[in-house]
Amino acid sequence: MAATAELQGKYQKLAQEYSKLRAQNQVLKKGVVDEQANSASLKEQLKMKDQSLRKLQQEMDSLTFRNQQLAKRVELLQDELSLSETRGKKNKKSAESSSQLSQEQKSVFNEDLQKKIEENERLHILYFEADEQHKRLEAELRTKLEVLESDAAQHQAVVDSLTRKYTDTIEKLQNDKSKLEIKSQTLEREAKDCRLRTEECQQQLKNLQAALGSRLEESLCIINEKVPFNDTRSNRYNALNVPLHNRRYQLKLRDLAGQALSFVQEIVTALLNFHTYTEQKAQIFPIDSATDTISPLNQKFSQYLHENAFYVRPLEEGMLQLFESITEDTVTVLETAVKLKAFSEHLASYLCFLRKILPYQLKSLEEECESSLCTAALKARNMELHRDMKRLTAIFEKLHTYVSLLALPSTKPEGLLRTNYSLVFTNIAASLHGSHDILKDISKHYSQKATLEQDVPTATQKLVTTNDCILSSILSLTNGVGKIASFFSNNLDHFTSSLSYGPKGGTEFISPLSAECMLQYKKKAVAYMKSLKKPCADSVPYEEALANRRVLLSSTESREGLAQQVQQSLEKIAKLEQEKEHWMLEAQLAKIKLEKENQKLKNSLSGHLAETVQERSVLSNTAEQKEETTEKSQREPIKTTSLIGMLTITTDNEKVPDVESREDLIKKHYMARIAELTSHLQLADSKSVHFHAECRALAKRLSLAEKSKESLTEELKLASQSISRLQDELMTTKRSYEDQLSMMSDHLCSMNETLTKQREEIDTLKMTSKGNSKKNKTR
């Protein structure tokens, strides 16, 4: 159904995009049509402008022609004028009247010439202006035409691309539509199949409910009749019931205890190193015991620190005893974990040790602050360590409180309710994380303190190495506590789910005495079951079982096809059986008819040999009459009925076929068929019994395979959990090593800086000593 919803959503999105593209296509089509109309109007305007341009060109040609004529006329007039002037010079003396006349003509000609020149200039100006206007208009129209042609080409390209895009999208949508239709049809078929399956499952559920109800009634009747003593309501008696043995749970719990033991060993080693190097530091700084006597406070502090192994080592021993008490055969719960009390006592003794050394440690830090060598920054670091040590002791007190609460069910079960022990585990995890954070702060502050102490003028190499050792021990302690905190948080659900036994819903723990009795009863039950245990029969080999499983899977896959083929073949066999019965009856009847015909022939041949010819002639007339009647009687069918059925036959005059013999033959035939069918039925019954036994065996194998599959899945889950846990441990160790390397690199850098400073100081001292020696020599 989710797939159909996704497909419908995709189809709706495609339809929306298609509608958007269609609307855009219509808008673009309108734009293209408008641009085409504009281009057509501009083409018409261009034609009109071309026509006007041609007219102007014609006018200009006519004007140029007229101008040329006028220029020629002016030249002629000038020539005539020059001729007249020459003639006038020659004939000045001849006639003054003619000179006056020529002067008048000359003035007229000059006026006419001046007018023509002015008109020619005006026409030239008009021609130039018209030419410039025509060129400008032509350039504008050409640019507009180019722009319109480019726009039209762009619009045409856009239209082509959109049409291609629309065709592609339409094809895609059609393909998607066909695919969606096919998928919808398949989903409808699947929905029908699912409905049928749900109906079958509901029917099976009803059958199972009815069967379970009947079984419940039977079991209740058996319990009421056969179980006279029922102690399920008494908590005292329930405490003595042996719980179910979960070997996998015991192995996992032992594995977790082993991991916790390794973490505790790491923490114990780090604590021993920390207290030992702290003792060494108290004897070195601020006063070195090798050169001077240290204060009584530090003497007492170092004396107490010297006893740290007496309090720290038992923690490892107590955890080892707890680990050894968790075996595969026992039932490990809080009521039976007696060794947890010993570990709690060892933790209490170590807590007393911490409380004993805490005042001396705080006073020692205060004494360092009061020293003249202590700077302000070093005092600040000492006060931070002062606060951190108080916090560390307080968090250890909280941890001891919760561990002692966990040890109560094995000693005093009334001190803790079953509903509260999960909260105790969560508080232990929180306390471990809090101690990890405090140790991080201690390592940071102590590293800063160590770098500041290296700058003290009286700092020795022994102090530097001691500080490095203390830092490494604090880092290892931080890593160990971080590992056990993450380990506890990762397995908190396992700890809180199944670390108690007893009746469900109970608020109190089982008493230790009852738990001890339960363990004794469990040992007795195990011994009794071992005495009853018989050697198992040889099972199917693993390879053969795998082969049988493959065959079973292949047979289940092809079962439906084979069932259809069997149904079709059964229908064909039934039809063929019917046809066979029909033709066998036809053959029997034909055989009977053949025998009767042969008998008739023999009787007719023996009867007619003794008759004479005269009798034939005499009886000829009567025979003709009888033949007519016999033909009629022969043609009339005779119906015979029996137990088998009805038979219609035509009889002769000579002899009627024996119906009883026919019935006997048919009866014999059916008896033979019945015997054959009974033999086939017996064979089919034996085969069905054999197949039923095989199916039961295969069902048993299938159930065993499912159980093995479940066990393998559980093992796979455990393996994945162990892999994740190992990866977490690897990451934590990697981070711790990286932190250590970074701290060591920082320490080396600081050491190099101090060495360079010391070398520079030595060089300066040497230079000053050389200068002083030279001054002394000069003196």
Swiss-Prot record:
Residues 85-105, 612-637, 760-779 are annotated as: Disordered. Pfam families: KLRAQ, PPP1R21_C, PPP1R21_helical. This is Protein phosphatase 1 regulatory subunit 21. InterPro entries: PPP1R21, PPP1R21_C, PPP1R21_N, PPP1R21_six_helix. One of its GO terms (molecular function) is RNA binding. Residues 96-105 have a biased composition (Low complexity). Residues 624-637 have a biased composition (Basic and acidic residues). It is found in: Early endosome.
